[in-house]
């Protein structure tokens, strides 16, 4: 008997990726976030498409077009709330996915890890240009502050900033091009996610123990399709109440006011998922230094495979490294909190200490912990 999914050229690829894929038998719920990110991406693309049908990317009508979507379009309020809060769930899954990769040593699949870091940067860029589109106060001033960082680049900075703006400040041309970027970038994210998956299936999934799982694998379907379906339900559990009952909980009240270049908000800050990076940017008094620290805080992920010193892949049996990992997680939460606070003492010094600890943990302490654990496990007789 010919089984269509095993012979048809297209179905065969899907079959090898999602049905007959051999998967380790012991992967935990931490491995659910990959599929959840895929689902988040689909939700964002679909809701975004329907929003784009009614949105106008002109400075004089952008704000009112968003109000029109919420008031006059059938279920427009729901589509917008799902899109805005779906972004928050997307980043929550993204951070947990990266955290799991660091904890269990998944970064040793270098190709998968590197394309993943590029994916993270692309998603961050997509979210940034998307936040500008409603053309509220925080949208406008957020765009002004972040794009102005380009002017910190020596020699070409000012020219580069004006090139991105399409003028001498954030204005109509900027909004139009940001809408174009926000429309095309999800397609690039989808393509890169496919490459990410392609590289992953070259090696197979890692597992909590970090040991080669080839001797004990099970088919992806039905075991992990059921597990991913449960993960989806648990994702919808916070997303739907958030979108239906308190959709503006994670937003900024300033964004309910139309953009006004003559009136600066008292505290300019991005969405919660960028606060850690914003805190790093603000913690350094020098403009160029802040920009470099901001870039380094994300790009440092690319060198994590080179800093792996342990004989064991996973942190599952490495208590010293585990402790440092959770200090790093707490440190990132501290940076997120600092990013939302005004630029005054004691927040400035807390932010500066947190950024020093962040780089110290990744570059020095965690590699040293790996070497120490190797030494402790060596037989001494």
UniProtKB/Swiss-Prot annotation:
Annotated membrane topology: Multi-pass membrane protein
Assigned GO CC terms? mitochondrial inner membrane; respiratory chain complex III
List the GO molecular function terms: metal ion binding; ubiquinol-cytochrome-c reductase activity
Domain of life of the organism encoding this protein:
Eukaryota
Stored Gene3D superfamilies: Cytochrome Bc1 Complex, Chain C
Query: What's this chain's function?
Result: Component of the ubiquinol-cytochrome c reductase complex (complex III or cytochrome b-c1 complex) that is part of the mitochondrial respiratory chain. The b-c1 complex mediates electron transfer from ubiquinol to cytochrome c. Contributes to the generation of a proton gradient across the mitochondrial membrane that is then used for ATP synthesis.
- This protein is called Cytochrome b
**What organism is this sequence from?**
Thylacinus cynocephalus
